[in-house]
């Protein structure tokens, strides 16, 4: 009994140690699940049902994304009073208790995207109203209506950035954003907005960026947000965009009206700073030249604007088109995928600062190049996929395209270009004339040649670096048509017979070429082995779709990185070819869709070792009339191929000799059977006496 107190003390001591140990383990586990670095606690995707309580109290940022929290209770965040950033993205939240943010006096950024806050929006709104320093709020993806959003944003005058994207907003008025005088950026994309009342944004005096993409707005009339710098109204159903007819200076710099149903060029502010205008994928056209101007009363459209008891009528001249718009600062204009049949006279003159013009996928049939049209500042012009059959260059005009660097004329109906057009573009580096039925001039055309040219001359274009002539129906090249250029990229694909089985017509640009595409040009059909030894800087070579029966030579071309030999007539992968230094330095090679013989792929193992075959699983070969994947071949030459290595004469001798001997014996027996006297004589002479 005297030892009982001692045992009790020891037991109590061990219980305390065990309890402290267990508590320490729990704390370590709660911190171990979250990544804590420099006052940032990242607890995303940990399947947490509540906010962890064991994180550092001085944490400034807490990320709880993708956890099934469901409810944010009053006490959930009490342990972290210094939070400045809180992210609760995709937490299944349907309720935020009244005092959940009561202790969060420092919170500036709050993300509540992709939750279910519409279910208890009044209580959640009460919780948000306690955040007096909040600057950024993300409420996207919560099924909020405009009334719910208005209640949640009420009294949050400190907000600078708000996202209400992917909700169910339909109609906006001045009550939704009331009191948000400091708001700079507003994201309303992917809602169901079909109407915006006049004055809905008038109280947002500091608003600079507005995103209304992916809604159902049918038109924007009397646009007067002069302070706005960025406006995105793409992917709506706009048929009209009309800025207010006032002399106030607009700050708008970027306007995106792409992917709508615009019928006319937008009427832009009369005084503005617009430098980027996106109008692709609409139904725009210029109609002045198509309309009978003798009926002025039919040349206007009137818009009736009803705002409460006030009715305004806006009258717009339909054929005025662009005349009153300020385009002087415009640098980037995209009008691709429209229905433009022509560009009005003077249109491009109003854009002296224009550097990028995209007109692809329209209905243009001709283009006149005059003084200041296109403007001298233009560096990139895309006229691809139109119906251009004529390019007109004003007589005596030189240097009109002196700053042009990228010129795309692909997929048109051009047969030639005006003499001197490319030489006036003295800075051009990239030219795409693919899919035009042009022909190359057999000799240099004089610059003072006045007759329309029916061919194209690329000689002596010193600045040209990239040229695409894919699918132009060109005949065999003669007399070095690229002489005087320093081409690094050349595409001659789909011009059958253009090289006439030899790469010698490219000798003038061979030292500078880095990327060469000779896809589907008829190489290898009855021609000698292709030799690219003179192409010392070649990095990429496309020889697919030809009839090559052997690997091309690359002696001295150590820069080669990519080689495409698909869809040829290669039957073997010799070891000697694979061991060449240029092929050993390859990074990517394509070899599929060739009729390889499995008995001739001894170089396959070395290629696999280099790990450069991009279409490895698609390469097949023929083994005993069976098509199998080369990766399934056993190491070394298959057993079935050994007979193929024996001398052919000896093979046939071994095959025929037994047949001949058998035939000789059979013939002798038959002959003797029908010659009975002779047979008896042989028997009598070959008869031996028996011992019996």
Swiss-Prot record:
Keywords: Cell membrane, Disulfide bond, Endoplasmic reticulum, Glycoprotein, Growth factor binding, Leucine-rich repeat, Membrane, Repeat, Signal, Transmembrane, Transmembrane helix. InterPro entries: Leu-rich_rpt (IPR001611), Leu-rich_rpt_typical-subtyp (IPR003591), LRR_dom_sf (IPR032675), SLRP (IPR050333). Key regulator of transforming growth factor beta-1 (TGFB1) specifically required for microglia function in the nervous system. Required for activation of latent TGF-beta-1 in macrophages and microglia: associates specifically via disulfide bonds with the Latency-associated peptide (LAP), which is the regulatory chain of TGFB1, and regulates integrin-dependent activation of TGF-beta-1. This is Transforming growth factor beta activator LRRC33. Glycans are attached at residues 74, 155, 232, 292, 309, 312, 408, 500, 622. The gene is Nrros. The chain crosses the membrane at residues 651-671. GO terms for cellular component: cell surface; endoplasmic reticulum; endoplasmic reticulum membrane; extracellular space; plasma membrane. Belongs to the LRRC32/LRRC33 family. Residues 25-650 are extracellular. Residues 606-643 form the LRRCT domain. It comes from the Eukaryota. GO terms for molecular function: receptor ligand inhibitor activity; transforming growth factor beta binding. It is a single-pass type I membrane protein. Residues 1-24 form the signal peptide. It comes from Rattus norvegicus (Rat). Residues 29-56 form the LRRNT domain. LRR repeats lie at residues 58-79, 82-103, 106-127, 133-155, 158-179, 182-203, 206-227, 228-239, 251-272, 273-294, 329-350, 353-374, 377-398, 403-424, 427-448, 463-484, 486-507, 512-533, 537-558, 559-580, 585-605. One of its GO terms (biological process) is superoxide metabolic process. It is found in: Cell membrane; Endoplasmic reticulum membrane. Its main location: membrane. PANTHER family: AGAP008170-PA, INSULIN-LIKE GROWTH FACTOR-BINDING PROTEIN COMPLEX ACID LABILE SUBUNIT. Residues 672-692 are cytoplasmic. Interacts (via LRR repeats) with TLR2, TLR3, TLR4, TLR9 and probably other Toll-like receptors. Interacts with CYBB/NOX2; the interaction is direct. Interacts with TGFB1; associates via disulfide bonds with the Latency-associated peptide chain (LAP) regulatory chain of TGFB1, leading to regulate activation of TGF-beta-1.
């Amino acid at each position: 009994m005297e030892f009982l107190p001692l045992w009790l003390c020891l037991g109590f001591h061990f219980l305390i140690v065990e309890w402290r140990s267990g508590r320490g383990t729990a704390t370590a586990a709660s911190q171990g699940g979250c990544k804590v670095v420099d006052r940032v606690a990242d607890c995303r995707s940990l399947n947490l049902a509540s906010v962890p309580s064991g994180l550092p109290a001085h944490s400034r940022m807490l990320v709880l994304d993708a956890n099934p929290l469901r409810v944010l209770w009053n006490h959930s965040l009490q342990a972290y009073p210094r939070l400045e950033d809180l992210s609760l993205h995709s937490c299944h939240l349907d309720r935020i208790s009244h005092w959940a943010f009561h202790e969060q006096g420092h919170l500036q950024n709050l993300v509540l995207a992709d939750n279910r806050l519409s279910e208890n929006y009044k209580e959640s709104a009460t919780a948000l109203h306690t955040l007096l320093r909040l600057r950024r709020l993300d409420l996207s993806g919560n099924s909020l209506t405009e009334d719910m959003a208005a209640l949640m944003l009420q009294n949050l005058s400190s907000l600078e950035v708000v996202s209400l994207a992917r909700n169910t907003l339909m109609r906006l008025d001045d009550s939704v954003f009331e009191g948000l005088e400091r708001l700079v950026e507003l994201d309303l994309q992917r809602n169901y907005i079909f109407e915006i009342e006049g004055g809905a944004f008038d109280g947002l005096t500091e608003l600079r960026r507005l995103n209304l993409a992916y809604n159902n707005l049918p038109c924007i009339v009397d646009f007067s947000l002069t302070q706005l710098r960025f406006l995105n109204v793409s992917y709506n159903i706009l048929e009209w965009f009309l800025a207010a007819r006032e002399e106030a200076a607009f700050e708008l710099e970027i306007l995106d009206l792409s992917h709508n149903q615009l019928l006319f060029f937008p009427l832009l502010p009369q005084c503005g700073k617009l430098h980027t205008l996106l109008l692709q994928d609409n139904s725009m056209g210029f109609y002045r030249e198509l309309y009978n101007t003798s009926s002025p009363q039919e040349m206007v459209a009137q818009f009736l604007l009803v705002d409460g008891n006030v009715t305004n009528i806006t009258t717009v001249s339909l054929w005025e088109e662009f005349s009153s718009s300020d385009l002087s600062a415009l640098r980037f204009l995209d009008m691709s995928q429209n229905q433009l049949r022509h560009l009005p006279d003077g249109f491009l003159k109003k854009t002296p600062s224009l550097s990028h013009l995209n007109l692809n996928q329209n209905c243009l049939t001709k283009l006149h190049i005059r003084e200041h049209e296109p403007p001298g500042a233009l560096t990139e012009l895309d006229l691809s996929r139109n119906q251009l059959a004529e390019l007109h260059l004003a007589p005596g005009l030189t240097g009109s395209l002196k700053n042009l660097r990228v010129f795309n004329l692909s997929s048109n109906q051009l047969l030639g270009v005006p003499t001197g057009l490319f030489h006036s573009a003295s800075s051009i580096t990239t030219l795409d004339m693919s899919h035009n039925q042009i022909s190359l001039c057999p000799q240099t055309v004089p610059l003072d040649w006045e007759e329309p040219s029916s061919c194209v001359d690329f000689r002596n274009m010193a600045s040209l670096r990239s040229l695409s002539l894919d699918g132009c129906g060109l005949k065999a090249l003669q007399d070095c048509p690229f002489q005087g250029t320093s081409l690094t990229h050349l595409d001659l694909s789909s011009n059958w017979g253009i090289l006439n089985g030899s790469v010698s017509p490219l000798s003038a640009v061979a030292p500078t070429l880095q990327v060469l595409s000779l896809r589907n040009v008829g190489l290898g059909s009855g021609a000698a082995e292709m030799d690219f030894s003179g192409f010392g800087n070649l990095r990429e070579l496309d020889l697919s779709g030809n009839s090559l029966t052997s690997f091309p030579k690359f002696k001295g071309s150590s820069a080669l990185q990519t080689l495409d030999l698909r869809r040829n007539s290669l039957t073997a992968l010799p070891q000697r070819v694979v061991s060449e230094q240029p092929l050993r330095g390859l990074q990517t090679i394509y070899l599929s869709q060739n009729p390889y013989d499995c008995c001739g792929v001894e170089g396959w193992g070395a290629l696999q070792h280099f790990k450069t075959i991009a279409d490895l699983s698609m390469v097949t070969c023929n083994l005993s009339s069976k098509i199998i994947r080369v990766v399934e071949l056993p190491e070394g030459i298959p057993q079935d191929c050994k007979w193929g290595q024996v001398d052919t004469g000896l093979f046939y001798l071994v095959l025929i000799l037994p047949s001949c001997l058998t035939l000789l014996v059979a013939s002798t027996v038959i002959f003797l059977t029908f010659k009975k006297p002779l047979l008896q004589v042989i028997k009598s002479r070959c008869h031996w006496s028996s011992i019996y």
